């Protein structure tokens, strides 16, 4: 999938799988996301039986194994599903729910219910009862439903199985989808298989929270990395601004390597368009630039609640612009970006070689700047080195304040580990902090990965967290190997061989469990062992979207602390990859 040709309709089943995985896991966690509807165990069981058939226009077609499941979902889950899709994908949809428990049964029912039952009320009738919101509609013909079903069968390689294959029950399909949702991502949460030792009370019936006051954001769970904020349907995002709630000034560790940048960011948040405009932050990957960008947006909105703030990656900006051309909505695109009080664009360097997007961004930049609105940008290099961007863009970037973030010193690295351990409720001895901080100097991401390995190893082996156990956990990712240059092809070749796959199978479109699990591990190892950005890694894996890599990384990180087999595989593969890179 190339970013420029991204299609929600084409990839909707994978989006559904990823979103449902996170919603189900979140609903059973002790600290559920306030933006996601809390659903009961019975409702979670119903959702696991749903198969996404496809998206046609604004109609989502879902498939259930029998009439009872279909009616139960129509009764209790229509509004929650619509709310989640609106929150995560910014889609206002209707639902067409079909039952596939025998064609004869459905055709017999057709005499009494001649049309597919569709939730056709839409956003203007949110106050209606759920039962009343499911009505007959001609929005989707039976031939269209069959067309989507056929596409779903082809996508899953199930042309011989049919829609209601006896070879794969609904429960098996749910488990398969849980493993196969690798194309597009939600965001970080505990895995469904994790059993909470202190389960939360039975959840109350869901009510719409769009206008309710939002509680304070929660911390990320133990062994779970800070969320990457690139996806437009990520867990922990704040409404239309797309600000990640976990990235604030309060949990940003300030040291000599980033002191000036942090101070500049606070100044911009306190006085938008009056202090430094534009503000341009640059530095290598993994040093906290994205964290600072989100923190600016949060603090600015805290001081001025009505402020219109939008965070976007350059890749999302490009996709949004291309979609506006394809859908003939250029004017809508302009309004969305030019009516803001603050526009924050991450990884601006990825606008390189995208001439049309550069042209549009140039005019957007001018419109905002002339209207005295704040612009914040980040890159992996200073403006003068962005030689692939147009001169007129570079000169505008240089017209404000340029600041950088550098590799953190030892004291700052220890402070970062301390804060991460506290947020994860991990008792990390001082000597272990010093060991990790002394060994991993390159980036904050390295520190995070090392901490996760140590805590996962101790949890799985039931060992105390000591310097000795930390040494064992980290022996396969020793910085002594940092002189070895590892590229994605090294990882792909080793992982493919390890799992008895070809490299084409590993990076291809196959969604069988053996392909997906190996692919996710390979993506995780690429993220850990290389310095490439998410979009670059997505390109290395068959041109996938960067959110696919994020999702894979999150899934493997979760498994590391819960599944010793995965932990051992990652350890062994790390050594094999480094040996392969040396050869």
Swiss-Prot record:
It holds the Pfam family Bac_DnaA. Keywords: ATP-binding, Cytoplasm, DNA replication, DNA-binding, Lipid-binding, Nucleotide-binding. Residues 91-241 are annotated as: Domain II. One of its GO terms (biological process) is regulation of DNA replication. Residues 242-458 are annotated as: Domain III, AAA+ region. Residues 172-182 have a biased composition (Basic and acidic residues). One of its GO terms (cellular component) is plasma membrane. GO terms for molecular function: ATP binding; ATP hydrolysis activity; DNA replication origin binding; lipid binding. The keyword Transmembrane helix does not apply. Residues 459-583 are annotated as: Domain IV, binds dsDNA. It is found in: Cytoplasm. Residues 1-91 are annotated as: Domain I, interacts with DnaA modulators. PROSITE patterns: DNAA (PS01008). ATP binds at residues 286, 288-290. Oligomerizes as a right-handed, spiral filament on DNA at oriC. Plays an essential role in the initiation and regulation of chromosomal replication. ATP-DnaA binds to the origin of replication (oriC) to initiate formation of the DNA replication initiation complex once per cell cycle. Binds the DnaA box (a 9 base pair repeat at the origin) and separates the double-stranded (ds)DNA. Forms a right-handed helical filament on oriC DNA; dsDNA binds to the exterior of the filament while single-stranded (ss)DNA is stabiized in the filament's interior. NCBIfam families: DnaA, PRK14086.1. Domain I is involved in oligomerization and binding regulators, domain II is flexibile and of varying length in different bacteria, domain III forms the AAA+ region, while domain IV binds dsDNA. Belongs to the DnaA family. This is Chromosomal replication initiator protein DnaA. It comes from Corynebacterium jeikeium (strain K411).
């Amino acid at each position: 999938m190339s970013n420029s040709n991204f299609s929600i309709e084409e990839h909707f089943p994978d989006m559904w799988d990823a979103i449902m995985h996170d919603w189900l896991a979140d609903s059973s966690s002790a600290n559920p996301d306030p933006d996601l509807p809390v659903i009961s165990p019975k409702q979670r069981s119903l959702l696991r039986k749903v198969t996404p058939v496809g998206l046609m226009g604004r109609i989502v077609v879902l498939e259930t194994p029998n009439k009872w499941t279909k009616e139960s979902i129509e009764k209790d889950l229509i509004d929650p599903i619509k709310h989640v899709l609106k929150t995560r994908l910014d889609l206002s949809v209707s639902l067409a729910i079909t039952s596939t428990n025998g064609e004869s049964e459905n055709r017999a029912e057709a005499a009494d219910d001649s049309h597919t039952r569709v939730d056709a009320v839409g956003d203007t009738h949110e106050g209606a009862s759920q039962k009343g919101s499911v009505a007959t509609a001609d929005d989707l013909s039976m031939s269209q439903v069959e067309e989507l079903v056929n596409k779903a069968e082809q996508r899953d390689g199930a042309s011989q199985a049919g829609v209601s294959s006896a070879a794969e029950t609904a429960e098996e399909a749910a488990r398969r989808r849980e493993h196969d949702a690798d194309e597009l991502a939600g965001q970080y949460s505990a895995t469904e298989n994790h059993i909470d030792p202190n389960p939360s009370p039975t959840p109350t019936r869901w009510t719409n929270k769009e206008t309710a006051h939002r509680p304070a954001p929660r911390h990320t769970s133990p062994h779970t990395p800070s969320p990457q904020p690139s996806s437009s349907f990520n867990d922990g995002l704040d409404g239309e601004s797309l600000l990640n709630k976990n990235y604030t000034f309060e949990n940003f560790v300030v040291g000599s390597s980033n002191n000036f940048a942090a101070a500049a960011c606070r100044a911009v948040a306190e006085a938008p368009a009056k202090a430094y405009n534009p503000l341009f932050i640059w530095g290598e990957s993994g040093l906290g630039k994205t964290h600072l960008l989100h923190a600016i947006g949060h603090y600015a909105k805290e001081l001025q609640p009505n402020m219109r703030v939008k965070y976007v990656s350059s890749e999302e900006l490009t996709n949004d612009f291309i979609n506006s051309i394809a859908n003939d909505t250029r004017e809508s695109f302009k309004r969305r970006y030019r009516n803001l009080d603050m526009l924050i664009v991450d990884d601006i360097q990825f606008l390189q070689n995208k001439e049309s997007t550069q042209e549009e961004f140039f005019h957007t930049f001018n419109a905002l700047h002339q209207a005295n609105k704040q612009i914040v940008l980040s890159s992996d290099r200073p403006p003068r080195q962005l030689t692939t961007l147009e001169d007129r863009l570079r000169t505008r970037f240089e017209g404000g304040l340029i600041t950088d973030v550098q590799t953190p010193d030892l004291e700052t690295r220890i402070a970062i580990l301390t804060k991460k351990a506290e947020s994860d409720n991990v008792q990390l001895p001082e000597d272990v902090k010093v060991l990790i901080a002394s060994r991993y100097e390159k980036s904050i991401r390295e520190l995070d990965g090392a901490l996760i390995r140590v805590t996962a190893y101790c949890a799985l082996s039931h060992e105390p967290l000591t310097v000795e156990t930390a040494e064992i956990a980290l022996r396969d990712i020793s910085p002594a190997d940092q002189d070895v240059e590892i590229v994605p092809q090294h990882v792909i070749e080793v992982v493919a061989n390890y799992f008895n796959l070809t490299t084409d199978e590993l990076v291809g479109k196959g969604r069988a469990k053996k392909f997906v699990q190996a692919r996710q591990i390979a993506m995780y190892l690429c993220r850990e062992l290389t310095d490439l950005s998410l979009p670059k890694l997505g390109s290395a894996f068959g041109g996938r979207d960067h959110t696919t890599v994020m999702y894979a990384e999150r899934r493997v990180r979760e498994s590391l602390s819960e599944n010793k087999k995965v932990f051992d595989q990652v350890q062994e593969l790390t050594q094999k990859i480094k040996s392969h890179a040396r050869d």
